[in-house]
Curated annotation (Swiss-Prot):
The keyword GTP-binding does not apply. The TFIID basal transcription factor complex plays a major role in the initiation of RNA polymerase II (Pol II)-dependent transcription. TFIID recognizes and binds promoters with or without a TATA box via its subunit TBP, a TATA-box-binding protein, and promotes assembly of the pre-initiation complex (PIC). Keywords: Cytoplasm, Nucleus, Phosphoprotein, Transcription, Transcription regulation. This is Transcription initiation factor TFIID subunit 11. Residues 7-16 have a biased composition (Polar residues). It is found in: Nucleus; Cytoplasm; Cytoplasm, Cytoplasmic ribonucleoprotein granule. Belongs to the TAF11 family. It comes from Drosophila melanogaster (Fruit fly). The modification Phosphoserine is found at S14, S16. The gene is Taf11. Belongs to the TFIID complex which is composed of TATA binding protein (Tbp) and a number of TBP-associated factors (TAFs). Interacts with Taf2 and Taf4. Component of the RISC loading complex (siRLC), composed of at least Dcr-2, r2d2 and Taf11, which loads duplex siRNA onto AGO2 to initiate formation of the RNA-induced silencing complex (siRISC). Interacts with Dcr-2, r2d2 and AGO2. Taf11 appears to form a tetramer which facilitates or stabilizes formation of the Dcr-2-r2d2 heterotetramer. InterPro entries: Histone-fold, TAF11-like, TAFII28_dom. It holds the Pfam family TAFII28.
Length: 196
């Protein structure tokens, strides 16, 4: 009757490499392994110890079960990825022109004063603000200013001028970012009707 219900079940006593661990456990528990012609007594003792413990040296023992790498190799690959990223940044910075290098250094050094950001946020919200929120807001403000400055530099380059950024370039950059919907609304609202 088992042959009808389970037609894929093999009657051989030998185990192939593709068999599951559960199948090995059940066959060793039922005593079918003792009748095997291919195993020698030395391997039976080792195999009995492995089956009784449930351990198998050929299987993954790191506990996550989803990959074949141990946990210490995953940490190593994460460290390697961080090191590769650092090397890429070093190559990129080494290929900067003098102007780009100065701009990059100023960007790295620049930050909004946290006390001023905290005071501004507390006056707007009317409640106390934690230090983590202040750090996040100063980072967001730095990214926002970076986008405006980048767009202003594009405007200046498109108009064929060079030198320091002037207010007219920054105003044009803000206007362009508003038309691209990449600028928060703030006080500026587009008119509902246009009279032309």
């Amino acid at each position: 009757m088992d042959e009808i219900l389970f037609p894929t079940q093999q009657k051989s006593n030998s185990l192939s490499d593709g068999d599951d661990v559960d199948l090995k456990f059940f066959q060793s528990a039922s005593g079918e392994r003792k009748d095997s012609d291919t195993s020698d007594p030395g391997n039976d003792a080792d195999r009995d110890g492995k089956d009784a413990d449930g351990d198998n040296d050929n299987k993954n023992t790191d506990g996550d079960g989803d990959s074949g790498e141990p946990a210490h190799k995953k940490l190593k690959t994460k460290k390697e990825l961080e090191e590769e990223e650092r090397e890429r940044m070093q190559v990129l910075v080494s290929n900067f022109t003098e102007e780009q290098l100065d701009r990059y250094e100023m960007y790295r050094r620049s930050a909004f004063p946290k006390a001023a950001v905290k005071r501004l946020m507390q006056t707007i919200t009317g409640c106390s603000v934690s230090q983590n929120v202040v750090i996040a807001m100063s980072g967001i403000a730095k990214v926002f200013v970076g986008e405006v400055v980048e767009e202003a530099l594009d405007v200046m380059e498109a108009q064929g001028e060079s030198g320091a950024l002037q207010p007219k370039f920054i105003r044009e950059a803000v206007r362009r970012l508003r038309t691209k919907d990449r600028m928060p609304i703030g006080r500026y609202q587009q008119p509902y009707f246009r009279l032309n």
